[in-house]
């Protein structure tokens, strides 16, 4: 699963996801893509599950690019533990996704196959997404 090799700090504040994606909102590598429509935190497990669903449907034809990386540590305290006594330990890694962010890109397959593969991948994610396609010039 995806996670940073090392970080400057072990734990982070929760923060908020404001505004729309400035960068990473256009197709950069592939012909087809999956674009986020709402803000949310997407964890590493969801990204990996979506990647597996996409590659499995494509039957190893074409190429997949993952355009998001889980770099935010999410902490949690154990169950039935009283409040206080410090912040909980890191449970999983997540990625803060803003609306308009390109999450996955694929190339080397037909539009029908790409649309279905990305639909299956989108079902694994906790954000509403949209299928996008490069405009022919």
Swiss-Prot record:
Keywords: Ribonucleoprotein, Ribosomal protein, RNA-binding, rRNA-binding, tRNA-binding
Oligomer status and interactors: Part of the 50S ribosomal subunit.
Job description of the protein: Binds 23S rRNA and is also seen to make contacts with the A and possibly P site tRNAs.
Protein name: Large ribosomal subunit protein uL16
InterPro entries named in the record: Ribosomal_uL16, Ribosomal_uL16_bact-type, Ribosomal_uL16_CS, Ribosomal_uL16_dom, Ribosomal_uL16_sf
Organism: Sinorhizobium medicae (strain WSM419) (Ensifer medicae)
Single GO biological process annotation from the record: translation
GO terms, molecular function: rRNA binding; structural constituent of ribosome; tRNA binding
Coiled coil spans: none
